[in-house]
């Protein structure tokens, strides 16, 4: 055999080896997390409680790796990692010198790909750009194929990655939520836009399949499962499942509702949130003539045991945990009255008085909008530590002061209360919009609000009533400004609200007739994140005094009427929402 013949033979061998996996049977385990929301550590930092965490997820993942072999396991996160817990906040904004803890954890845990979520974008460019660089340096792509640069039309983040396991080529594509522009200020996602997942995901899948010739295709989207009727931009999971071709697994997220939907050709997995479950998909391949001849798919959810953690991982990140704990437990002031969010559902409350007081102090605000941000949050009076500020205000929302007419303010409040209450003519009805239905998280029936309580905005700076016997449009009667000045529907006012709300979050601005796509034209001033305002307030005032935060000359007064209907009906509904232990 001459050299040319030998070279040709070698080339043929090389090409044959690249043509596809060897004939035989293969099985891969796809493990997924999503909406981790900063639950990196298993401690609540105070009180000695144990919570579900990435520490416990690691133990769960390793048990599968031990059973089937590390090379047969693929680990993917579907986004919303960098917001929601003290640890994320600390490494996002407080200690920006130490390498961010999440990329280090993702490397330690062996993640193959991470998807960008809307709350990751909410942290701002400095944070997510840094995290993206760190992840990429560890060989972990930060995926968001629908985040398109304004300057050149190319993706801002990575679109996909290819894994090669035992000769099998596995493509993972990732996409962020398409609705981000309706929630977040453009300042947080400057330089890019977020495309609709339909038809973009299919287009990108087709490109990747044509270029990379993968044997397995996984799509990870930071989008809720949804209803599949095409009506919700933030919930496109089932819309995708109905239309995608050439995809084996669709990983969904965002809504915090754990669910799996198996089928012979495409499995949907949504692991819920906060490390409660690990999504688990299995794909078994039969390869004949170096091509995939058949596939079998299955999916399930694996419950995570919060008490069973990886002790080696705990040791590895112990110094990081101590740094977060020290930050979390430092004293910041005194609270002179209990703060609870549940009281906000029935009228004015100390909790919302505080939010309104700080918001309306953002000059030149005359009015403020605010809602209870947790369903049943509570902080007991006494010494405050920084951890309490996360309970009072769990999100990284900035405060915007926005121009609105008096009529827009009234229409906004009418829209808010229409989500909150029913029209009733006697105490026998449900004054609160609640229903007895299955809880997606527990599987048990319980009473809950039909709408999201964090969209139940009330107003500070006004004196008004809300008549529960009247329909939407005539419930809200604004008597005056807090200081007694007349309120004029034709006049323009400066209104303080969160960046989330101003950008269209919750849809209330739209229902008031305001185009949030042009909100920059209405913004007259911006302020830092609300938690920073609260921290600075405590530095200046030392304590939170109910007499100060409840000053009617500053925040006004509002109430539901008529009392003879409201009082007994509210008591009945609140007992259903928050039953007393017997």
Language-model region placement:
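Catalytic centers of hydrolytic enzymes
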Residues: 23-29, 38-47, 51, 55-66, ...
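Acidic, metal/ion-coordinating pockets
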Residues: 19-306, 312, 346-358, 368, ...
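Bacterial N-terminal signal peptides that target proteins for export
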Residues: 1-7
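C-terminal motif of bacterial Sec signal peptides marking the signal peptidase cleavage site
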Residues: 14-17
């Amino acid at each position: 055999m001459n050299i040319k013949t030998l070279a040709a033979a070698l080339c043929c061998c090389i090409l044959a080896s690249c043509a596809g996996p060897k004939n035989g049977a293969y099985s891969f385990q796809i493990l997924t997390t999503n909406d981790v929301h900063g639950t990196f550590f298993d401690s609540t930092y105070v009180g000695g409680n144990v919570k579900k965490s990435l520490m416990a997820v690691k133990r769960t993942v390793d048990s599968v790796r031990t059973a089937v072999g590390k090379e047969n396991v693929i680990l993917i996160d579907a986004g919303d990692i960098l917001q929601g817990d003290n640890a994320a906040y600390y490494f996002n904004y407080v200690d920006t010198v130490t390498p961010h803890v999440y990329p280090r954890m993702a490397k330690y845990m062996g993640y193959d790909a991470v998807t960008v979520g809307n709350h990751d974008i909410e942290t701002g460019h400095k944070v997510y750009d840094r995290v993206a660089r760190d992840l990429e340096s560890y060989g972990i792509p930060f995926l968001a194929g629908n985040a398109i640069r304004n300057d050149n039309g190319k993706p801002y983040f990575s679109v996909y990655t290819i894994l090669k396991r035992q000769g099998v080529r596995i493509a993972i594509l990732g996409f962020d939520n398409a609705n981000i522009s309706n929630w977040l200020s453009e300042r947080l996602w400057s330089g890019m836009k977020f495309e609709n997942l339909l038809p973009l995901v299919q287009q990108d899948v087709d490109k990747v399949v044509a270029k990379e010739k993968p044997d397995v295709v996984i799509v990870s989207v930071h989008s809720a499962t949804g209803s599949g009727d095409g009506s919700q931009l933030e919930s496109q999971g089932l819309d995708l499942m109905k239309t995608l071709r050439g995809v084996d697994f669709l990983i969904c997220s965002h809504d915090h509702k754990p669910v799996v939907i198996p089928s012979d050709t495409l499995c949907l997995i949504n692991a819920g949130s906060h490390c409660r479950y690990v999504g688990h998909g299995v794909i078994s391949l039969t390869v004949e003539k170096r091509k995939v001849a058949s596939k079998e798919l299955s999916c399930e959810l694996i419950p995570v045991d919060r008490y069973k953690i990886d002790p080696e991982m705990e040791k590895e990140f112990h110094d990081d945990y101590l740094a977060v704990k020290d930050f979390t437990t430092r004293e910041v002031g005194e609270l002179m009255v209990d703060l609870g969010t549940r009281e906000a559902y029935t009228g004015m409350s100390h909790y919302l008085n505080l939010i309104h007081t700080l918001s309306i102090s953002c000059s030149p605000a005359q009015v403020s909008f605010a809602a209870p941000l947790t369903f049943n949050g509570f902080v007991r009076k006494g010494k405050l530590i920084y951890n309490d500020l996360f309970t009072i205000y769990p999100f990284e929302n900035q405060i915007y002061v926005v121009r609105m007419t008096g009529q827009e303010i009234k229409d906004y409040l009418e829209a808010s209360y229409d989500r909150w209450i029913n029209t009733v003519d006697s105490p026998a009805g449900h004054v609160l919009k609640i229903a007895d239905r299955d809880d997606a998280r527990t599987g048990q029936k319980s009473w809950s609000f039909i709408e999201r309580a964090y969209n139940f905005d009330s107003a500070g700076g006004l004196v008004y009533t809300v008549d529960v016997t009247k329909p939407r449009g005539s419930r809200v009667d604004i008597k005056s400004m807090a200081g007694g000045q007349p309120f004029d529907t034709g006049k323009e006012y400066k209104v303080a609200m969160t960046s989330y709300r101003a950008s269209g979050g919750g849809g209330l601005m739209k229902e008031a007739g305001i185009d949030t796509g042009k909100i920059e034209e209405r913004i007259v001033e911006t302020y830092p994140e609300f938690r920073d305002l609260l921290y600075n307030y405590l530095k200046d005032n030392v304590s939170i005094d109910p007499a100060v935060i409840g000053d009617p000359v500053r925040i006004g007064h509002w109430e539901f009427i008529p009392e003879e209907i409201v009082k007994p009906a509210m008591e009945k509904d609140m007992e259903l929402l928050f039953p007393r232990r017997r």
